[in-house]
Amino acid sequence: MANALGFRDLGLIDYETAWHAMQRFTDGRGREAGDEVWLVQHPPVFTQGQSGKAEHLLLPGNIPVVQVDRGGQVTYHGPGQLVAYLMLDVRRLGFGVRDLVTRIENTLIALLADYGVTAAAKADAPGVYVDGAKIASLGLRIRNGCSFHGLALNVDMDLEPFRRINPCGYAGLAMTQLSDQAGQIEFSEVSVRLRAQLVKHLDYAEQATLTGGINQYD
């Protein structure tokens, strides 16, 4: 079992600021560096993964599109969506990529179960689904044995922008969110519960709250 998993709660932050900081954190970390999770929300943005195809961007309109270095195709981020960026030394943890994905999916399934929502993963389409509608997306990059990017859970947000794309490359894929499934919820409580489930499913001994922002990685 690993030691503490550190969490930074960064609030609403520009996507590209977070992305470039993730890259610098990953490229600069030593073998003894602690693992971190950054909890954020983003202003509206579409992100296109490495295997993304232009035809899946239907009508982006005034929402910016950012080409990024994670796996997968196009997705949407916006306020009311809880994003967790996982900067983990997966080589030290002993996880393969498929194992890591499964652990993240199980984290989300357990979190949703806390709210009485039954969710499941799909073998051929990473993410978490409720009655066939996608409630959480995953996208990772592994570099030098360390992960970055992570997960996005739809909590209480405007889902309309998902209709401007084929989410994750699937035409007509229905999207849902926790507030539609469980009623009124506190965003901050979801974040706290996600922290606990990540520590459990990623086999850490405990969690730690990290202070300070990510300006150190500018």
From Swiss-Prot:
The active site is at residue 168. Substrate binds at residues 70-77, 137-139, 150-152. One of its GO terms (cellular component) is cytoplasm. The record marks 134 as: Lowers pKa of active site Cys. Pfam families: LplA-B_cat. InterPro entries: aa-tRNA-synth_II/BPL/LPL, BPL_LPL_catalytic, Octanoyltransferase, Octanoyltransferase_CS. This is Octanoyltransferase. It comes from Pseudomonas syringae pv. tomato (strain ATCC BAA-871 / DC3000). The gene is lipB.
